């Protein structure tokens, strides 16, 4: 009986790790780490969150990309022009020390200000 339990447990762990690993490495064509690699860097990742360090130079427009729901923490004052799929562009002032909740989104972002945009994105995986 113990041997059967050990084999079942091992099989469950292997299958679970395979599924989890596959879900984290399956390429999303709109993943910002892939399409905007010059501005989006993974700072931390586990099964629950992915934290991105984002630095958008003044005048830079990022390609269209996707984020799941999560929290943005702003580390600089800058002007962001965001265009969400199906909606008109909107310019927002981002202030250092503030934060904002975002639902899942597909968008482009342009830094229309004169300073670098610095953001920590906390993307939730559930």
Question: Could you tell me what each predicted segment is?
Answer:
Residues 9-17:
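Bacterial N-terminal signal peptides
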Residues 61-62, 78-83, 99:
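Short beta-strand segments in beta-sandwich/barrel cores
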Residues 87-104:
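Short acidic-glycine-tyrosine-enriched beta hairpin
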